[in-house]
A protein has these predicted regions:
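Polytopic transmembrane helical bundles with strong interfacial aromatic enrichment
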Residues: 1-331
Length: 331
């Protein structure tokens, strides 16, 4: 694996992790030891956002590899090429990590919501299964585990496309349970969040696929980049619009109605993080479009334009991912 590819991956993980921790402290949402007896300790509380981040990164890796096989590296006629088969195997490996994180997240979530040490959850098994968030994580884990097994030896783009549909289905349960109340603005926010998660995963996963497989063929790189540009353009619009709708619904829920949206936006930690995240995504949309348009014509002449394109997008995307996890932890 090229050194710059490793550096890009490690850098993205570090940036996302730092953004998550800094945002949690800045918003006052960092896990705390409440000093109670019999509940989960501080370590378990910190595991929740960290597992969410690991799960998100694994999701991006799985989605990116599948998108690469189905869209970026598409070969006319159906069968996957060498890089396409490699991408499918990578997607299977990422799906295994995603499934493990989902199951571990279910255990940690149950421990926190039921205020029970992990070691004693077996005594409250039925209670844990009754928690919507836990059920959603278990459903996700089962779907993703089936995905990992099913796509392991896929040989055609159509079969890999079915894997994409399963991956999308696995994103829905946890997104749906993020807004359990029934007010109109909460229902709207929940529906928009589902679209937001799918679009964001497609966009970020597409970039991951571009970084991982885009330079496998120097002569094919402009074509791969053009395909990624189309995916990124559609996904970025969907991410922005669905994110704004979801955020508006969440702010209405926090403020008590549509007329009180500005109160939590200007005077709440969630509102501050939301503004930073929106700014990061707007910056990402503008910069990525500018870099792709300027560097596209020079790709065949050298490697620097390619890494200039993905470097900027990776940095801002990793920052936005960390902020997204922090937002999900901010009440």
């Amino acid at each position: 694996m090229p050194g710059r590819l490793v550096a890009a991956g490690v850098g993205a993980v570090v940036i996302a992790s730092v953004a998550l921790v800094v945002a949690l402290f800045a918003a006052g949402s960092r896990p705390r030891d409440l000093g109670g007896v019999g509940g989960p300790d501080l370590f378990i509380s910190w595991l929740l956002p960290l597992l969410k981040l690991m799960s998100t990164l694994a999701t991006v890796g799985c989605a990116g590899a599948l998108l690469a096989a189905v869209v970026l590296l598409r070969i006319e006629g159906g069968p996957l090429g060498v890089q396409g088969r490699r991408a499918v195997r990578d997607a299977s490996n990422s799906a295994i990590i995603w499934a493990v994180c989902a199951f571990a997240n279910a255990v940690v979530t149950a421990a926190i919501l039921l205020d029970t040490p992990v070691g004693l959850l077996r005594m409250r098994f039925d209670d844990a299964l009754g928690v919507p968030e836990v059920k959603a994580l278990l459903i996700t884990g089962i779907l993703v585990l089936a995905l990992a097994i099913g796509i392991r030896r896929v040989q055609t783009s159509s079969a890999a496309g079915l894997g994409v549909l399963v991956a999308i289905a696995a994103l829905i349960p946890t997104a749906v349970t993020a807004y359990p109340r029934n007010e109109s603005y909460v229902v709207l926010a929940g529906a928009a969040l589902v679209l937001h998660v799918i679009a964001a995963t497609t966009w970020v996963g597409g970039l991951a696929g571009l970084v991982r497989y885009g330079r496998a063929s120097r002569t094919g790189l402009p074509i791969v980049l053009e395909r990624y540009g189309q995916v990124a353009y559609i996904s970025s619009i969907a991410v922005l619009l669905s994110g704004l709708i979801s955020a508006a619904g969440r702010l209405a829920a926090k403020g008590g109605g549509w007329g009180s949206i500005l109160d939590p936006l200007t005077g709440d930690a969630y509102g501050a993080l939301l503004i930073v995240k929106i700014a990061a995504f707007l910056l990402l949309i503008v910069l990525s479009a500018l870099h792709r348009s300027r560097a596209h014509g020079d790709l065949v002449d050298g490697g620097q334009p390619f890494w200039r394109i993905v470097g900027v997008e990776l940095f801002v995307m990793a920052l936005a991912l960390g902020l997204s996890i922090a937002l999900s932890q901010t009440i």
